[in-house]
């Protein structure tokens, strides 16, 4: 038959661990309800525990041995487990969510409320002192009160076991043994004060006592100018001296501070919504993005720009090429604007500086069939200003969708789609985009062609049309050095 141990036997424990930690396993005293269960007992305080896991945190007296410390600035408390740290963190919160249903007292922790509810227990008998008339809810408080009366008369004997003591303090400590609490060594004053000879039971009592030496009074009464060094002294002062003010606070209605804070939050969200998401047609047509937020709100060094009524340049062109704009925006004439503070990059869109590919695609659709070729001469227009105005209207009338389609048609590259074909052909040279066409020239043909193009505007100054683009500059050596007569674009190489 196999025997299973419910706890660790005492003979398995390491003697070295007992010396370092200060605890050992001792069997429970035999009695009427003798059991084989082994319990742990602290050698220092004599506190019994059901297992070693509960005794181990108890045997860590120094704060540096407790791994979980409170992150608050002036707290300095450390704990042996995460649970005790989280339970302690509730005391630093300004909110007290646990309220007593009988006296409206608030508590940070639920166990504190549970201990407080024992004072309102109707099943508990009220212990009445016949000498002074005080009532007590606990037997320990009642016995301690009777011991104080007996000590004042000179009797230092326990009324339960008739044991005599030398001082009143020793008698009060002995009374805890009759209230099912650990007496004697468990309540030894082992925490001394660094400034005087007094000793205390816990480190909390030492910190509370330090107010006597430092003179700090951090607790201010909200009804008067009086300050206190301890919070319990402030609470006692408020209940004693300002009881009428406390009653007025309880009877006052709820203020509207929460509603005002909610409305301010909504207003901020409404200010930011046109910038963070796509606005409607009315907002796009009537309001400009530079004037959405008040510029002086976040810094006085930023100059405020007047609202011009033109949408931001990045709004229309941040969409991918080939996608149509979801909103139908009508062209709006804008007055003369100041130069921008920051220079726009290559991704910005300016109507007066269009790429050459867009100009060629627009010229192909203009009424009158304007052409850039000097091989087909046309009669010169007597009014070049009218033609320039006609070109400006055509540029403004073009929608962003057509602009993106023209850009896509001239810059499509199929090399990443046809890269799997086993073609051992010479590499493609950088194409020269002229009017949306991709052409390749040999090295022998490139130089005479450039010379011809440069001489054309000088030979026929008035026969090329109303537009004059000036002499063409020669290509840099990066683009002309590697040209070949047999080179074709990649799209045609794939289908040779």
Swiss-Prot record:
Single biological process term from Gene Ontology: regulation of transcription by RNA polymerase II
Signal peptide: none
Main location: nucleus
GO cellular component: nucleus
Record carries keyword Transcription regulation: yes
GO MF term set: DNA-binding transcription activator activity, RNA polymerase II-specific; DNA-binding transcription factor activity; DNA-binding transcription factor activity, RNA polymerase II-specific; sequence-specific DNA binding; zinc ion binding
InterPro entries: Znf_C2H2_sf, Znf_C2H2_type
Keyword Glycoprotein: no
Alphabetic keyword roster: Activator, DNA-binding, Metal-binding, Nucleus, Repeat, Transcription, Transcription regulation, Zinc, Zinc-finger
ZnF (C2H2-type) intervals: 68-92, 98-120, 127-149, 156-178, 191-213, 219-242
Domain of life: Eukaryota
Compartments reported by the entry: Nucleus
Described purpose of this protein according to its UniProt entry: Shows weak transcriptional activatory activity.
Protein family membership: Belongs to the krueppel C2H2-type zinc-finger protein family.
Name recorded for this polypeptide: Zinc finger protein PLAGL2
Gene from which the chain derives: PLAGL2
